[in-house]
Amino acid sequence: VLVDVDLRKSVIKDRHHIKDADKLPDLGYFLSGQSEMEDVIYETQVENAYIVPCMNLLENPSALLEDARFAELLDKLAETYRYVIIDSPPLGSVADAAQIASLCDGAALVVRAGETSRSLIKQSFQQLDQVGCTLLGVILNRAQTTGRAYKKYYGKYGKYYSQYGYGYGTYGKEAAASSDGTPSK
């Protein structure tokens, strides 16, 4: 289940094309006591994938996240679903992100290629450490995969992987040619 906890600037509802989003109960309804958990979980178009969206912007999201209902929601979701993935606001931008991370087993830090500074990344690592959240990894987002810089670094791997038969070079062809029982080179 994906839980959209970016209560100030959510983009999940638009990406999932939820119709009449502003009229449906969402995470804010649950946190404010207006809905039960079952009322704010929606099926997605992906089999066995669900979402708890934030479809309406909230005035005081920090207070709602500090309430015990949020921690209870995460506990109940963890009992029901194999994975609970939380989309939070960026670390360093609002206190919510570190607060949310403190309730998680781990975090994957998403950084935008060419825009996120090293100092902000380092600060994010420190924030996760301070709240006791394990850094699971870093996801590089919007990386340029064409052009000279990309080819300079990654282009050499075609030659390297050819010896392992990953679709490059002639490894597969040599193995097929020697199928008569004679050893290949």
Predicted region positions:
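P-loop NTP-binding module
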Residues: 1-185
